[in-house]
Amino acid sequence: MIYFCTADLRRGYSLLQRGHRLEKRLITNLGGISFLDCVEECLRTTRCLSVNYFQPAHFCEVNYKKKESLPDLYFVNSGWYYSERDDWDKAIAGPCSNPNCKENEKCVPKAFGNIKCEISDCGIPTNEGISFENVQDGDAIGINRKMHITCLDGYERQGSEVFICQPNGVWKADLICKKTNLST
């Protein structure tokens, strides 16, 4: 189905940050799509706050954080573009411009202007004592993705440091971080 789009793109393009990338806070990534398709994916994904786009390879990264909250992970990076969700007209998302999807869902357009909310991610792990220090470039919280998570200093690790996001939106993980008892 073809939709007539009346979205204003000027503001979004004027605020685009060329040569920058926010690292290690991905929901998912997609290859072979245009920059505007990348922005639309963000607008349809409830948890998305920003995107990175690598122009030479038409590669999109959908982020769950903004640069303001993680300045240490925001880098100058040639070929990349960084943009925030709030900079874009929601009308780009067509029938998904005002969905009522849950935080870990994304809006998927269907025939005749209908929409469907589908699970997009497992959320940000909140287990006691965990650290995102070992998250690797390419790790993500999206469905069928994995993250490398370890324990904070002062905690003992039991189990694997690899969390896998299952299709039902629940992490598969056996990492337990137990507070160590240090005698002084």
Where do the protein language model's features map onto the residues?
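Cleavable N-terminal signal peptides of Sec/SRP-targeted secreted and luminal proteins
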Residues: 1-7
